[in-house]
Amino acid sequence: FPYTTLFRSHMGKRFVFPHNDMEGLRKQLQRATALADKQNGGVLVITEGVFGMPGDLGKLDEIVAMKRDFKFRLLVDDAHGFGTMGKTGAGTGEHLGVQDQIDVFFATFAKSMAGIGAFVATEEEIIAYLKYNMRSQIFAKSLPMPMVFGALKRLELLKTKPQYKAKLWEITRALQNGLRKNGFNIGNTNS
């Protein structure tokens, strides 16, 4: 997701919280909410479903729980979770039981789907705004039809062949265990 483009193009204030630090997020939400209330604005929390480099999961369930105390929208970039996490492969939100509480869901077809392109799942109004206002989309073309058909077929396989995802996890665990056994430090990945 082109975060830098998003940050440069918006007129609001940006608050950053440390990686997966929920107390840090809470403090920033207090600051952001106070400012948003004063300026009649809104708050958008951006995180990842699976953090690509360390491989740990975003604490989406804990972030969603904060919606009881703060008013904000949640954008999840789940490039590494879509197709691999959750019962149906819908992503990390599904895996953690909060997929329906994610306001803006972004993922790519380039990772688990072995294709090109990406998608945003959200309200129609937001999609229309992004489509016609994001610099990266103004002169963009639609995906080539063979790539669309390929993505649709892979989505169908995700739904109808759960054994493929199970095999992926079997191979993943074998690789992780083999690397650890041979002295490689692969961190504390849970993906």
Name these PLM-found stretches:
Residues 2-6:
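Short, small-residue-biased leader/transition segments that mark boundaries at the very start
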Residues 9-11, 101:
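Short, structured coil segments at secondary-structure junctions
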Residues 10, 69-70, 182:
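Helix C-cap/helix->beta junction micro-motif
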Residues 15, 19-76:
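Active-site phosphate-binding strand-loop segment of PLP-dependent enzymes
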Residues 17, 43, 106, 140-141, ...:
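Short beta-strand
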Residues 58, 145, 152-191:
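Conserved PLP-dependent catalytic core of the aminotransferase class-I/II
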Residues 70-71, 91-109, 128, 132:
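Conserved active-site segment immediately N-terminal to the catalytic lysine
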Residues 104-106, 113-162:
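Conserved core segment of the aminotransferase class I/II
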